[in-house]
């Protein structure tokens, strides 16, 4: 039996201590030998990102998971800075920028609103697939495979049992993250 794919889980939450949902989701990831959990706010509280180190981490993993809350229809500021600086031209895109080609990108998002708020006729005016389009485009720019996002809607209002169920499913996926024929 082959080894599971190496997963780099980039976790970005500026107030992690207050996010029960994200803490519960992270727990199974920390127990898997094929997963490297990398807390960006813990490593870079000053926003000075070690770009060569981050690019080396990306090279060492097949699956890159971006776990974060949805902030103003995007990601927290440090993750945006990370995306802009680390996924640079010549490394991840443009001429010679093929270091991530063929790898997998998956977004794991928590929201503060119910799924019903993400429709053309609802509060946010757009479905989540439209809101996450910039991330899908970034994956394409890097020549990565875009995997369907995992979205925990209205994370604060999930019961302990619901969060545990999400965490189990997430942990099961992390243990074997590639689709059939993915390698």
From Swiss-Prot:
Disulfide bonds: none annotated. It is an enzyme of class 1 (oxidoreductase). Its EC number is 1.6.5.2. GO terms for cellular component: plasma membrane. It catalyses: a quinone + NADH + H(+) = a quinol + NAD(+); a quinone + NADPH + H(+) = a quinol + NADP(+). It is a peripheral membrane protein. Coiled coil: none annotated. Keywords: Cell inner membrane, Cell membrane, Membrane, NAD, Oxidoreductase. It comes from the Bacteria. Interacts with KefB. This is Glutathione-regulated potassium-efflux system ancillary protein KefG. The gene is kefG.
């Amino acid at each position: 039996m082959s080894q599971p794919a190496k997963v780099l889980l980039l976790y970005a939450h500026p107030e992690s201590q207050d996010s029960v949902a994200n803490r519960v989701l992270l727990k199974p990831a920390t127990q898997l030998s094929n997963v490297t959990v990398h807390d960006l706010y813990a490593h870079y509280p000053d926003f000075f990102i070690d770009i060569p180190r981050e690019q080396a981490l990306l090279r060492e993993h097949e699956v890159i998971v971006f776990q974060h809350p949805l902030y103003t229809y995007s990601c927290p500021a440090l993750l945006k800075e990370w995306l802009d600086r680390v996924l640079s031209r010549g490394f991840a895109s443009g001429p010679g920028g093929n270091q991530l080609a063929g790898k997998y990108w998956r977004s794991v998002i928590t929201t503060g609103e119910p799924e019903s708020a993400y429709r053309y006729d609802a509060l946010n005016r757009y479905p989540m697939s439209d809101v996450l389009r910039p991330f899908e485009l970034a994956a394409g720019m890097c020549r990565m495979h875009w995997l369907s996002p995992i979205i925990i809607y209205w994370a604060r209002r999930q019961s302990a049992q619901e969060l545990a169920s999400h965490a189990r499913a997430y942990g099961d996926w992390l243990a074997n993250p590639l689709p059939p024929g993915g390698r």
